[in-house]
C-alpha cells in the first residue's frame, strides 16, 4: 500500500477530522499504545506535521491489515472494525445520507455512543471515557447528534434503523463495545434497557 500524506493538505479540515475518527478507532479497538500516541500528539497531527501523519496512517493500515488477515471473510474478529458504525450508520440513514453530516462525523458520534454503552455494561472505562470525549471536543469533532437530525427520529425509529445493520443476526442488534481502551469485542448479550438509555441520551 502506498499513501501520499501530502495530499491530505488539499482537504478541508472537516474531511481530515472525518478521517481521523477512523484512525483513532484502531487505537480504541486494539492498540492502546497507538491511542496514547494519538492523544499525546493531537496538536502535531492537526497542524499536518508530515512525520506524524505518516506515523498515524502507517499504524492505521498496519492494524487493519492484522485484522483482515485474521478474518478475510468477516466471520469473527473483523467485526470490531465497525466500532461506532452501528450507531453511526443509523444516524446517517435517519439524515437520509445528506451532506450536512459526513460518514466520519456520524462514526465519531457513534464511537461516543459505543463508549457510553460499554461503560453502562460495567466495563473498565469510566475514568477513560472523559479523556476520549475531551480529545474529540478539543479537535472539534462531532460528539452529539445535531438537532436537525434529532427532530427526525425517536427511540423506536432509531432502533428500527439500527436493525438494518449487517451485524444484525436473527433480528438482534450486535454491538461492538470496549472492555477497556484498546480492547474491543462483539457484544451479542447486553441490557436492552441500557441501550435504550444511551439512544435516548443522544436523541433527546
Regions found by a protein language model. Give the residues of each.
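C-terminal charged capping/lid subdomain of soluble metabolic enzymes
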Residues: 21, 123-204
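Generic alpha-helical structural context detector
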Residues: 21-26, 58, 113, 160
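Short beta-strand segments
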Residues: 2, 82, 176-178
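Short, acidic Gly/Pro/Ser/Thr-rich loop/turn segments
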Residues: 8-10, 88-89, 183-184
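Residues in soluble alpha-helical coiled-coils and helical-bundle/repeat scaffolds
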Residues: 25, 29, 47, 120-123, ...
Amino acid at each position: 500500500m502506498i499513501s501520499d500524506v501530502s495530499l491530505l493538505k488539499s482537504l478541508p479540515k472537516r474531511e481530515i477530522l472525518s478521517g481521523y475518527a477512523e484512525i483513532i478507532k484502531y487505537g480504541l479497538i486494539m492498540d492502546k499504545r497507538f491511542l496514547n500516541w494519538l492523544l499525546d500528539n493531537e496538536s502535531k497531527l492537526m497542524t499536518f506535521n508530515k512525520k506524524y501523519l505518516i506515523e498515524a496512517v502507517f499504524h492505521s493500515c498496519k492494524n487493519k491489515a492484522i485484522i483482515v488477515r485474521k478474518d478475510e471473510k468477516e466471520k469473527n474478529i473483523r467485526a470490531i472494525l465497525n466500532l461506532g458504525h452501528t450507531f453511526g450508520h443509523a444516524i446517517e440513514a435517519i439524515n437520509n445520507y445528506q451532506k450536512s453530516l459526513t460518514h466520519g462525523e456520524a462514526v465519531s458520534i457513534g464511537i461516543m455512543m459505543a463508549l457510553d454503552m460499554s461503560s453502562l455494561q460495567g466495563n473498565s472505562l469510566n475514568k477513560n471515557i472523559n479523556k476520549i470525549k475531551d480529545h474529540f471536543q478539543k479537535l472539534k469533532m462531532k460528539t452529539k447528534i445535531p438537532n436537525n437530525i434529532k427532530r427526525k427520529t425517536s427511540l423506536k425509529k432509531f432502533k428500527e434503523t439500527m436493525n438494518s445493520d449487517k451485524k444484525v443476526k436473527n433480528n438482534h442488534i450486535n454491538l461492538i463495545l470496549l472492555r477497556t481502551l484498546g480492547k474491543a469485542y462483539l457484544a451479542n448479550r447486553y441490557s436492552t434497557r441500557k441501550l435504550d438509555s444511551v439512544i435516548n441520551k443522544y436523541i433527546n
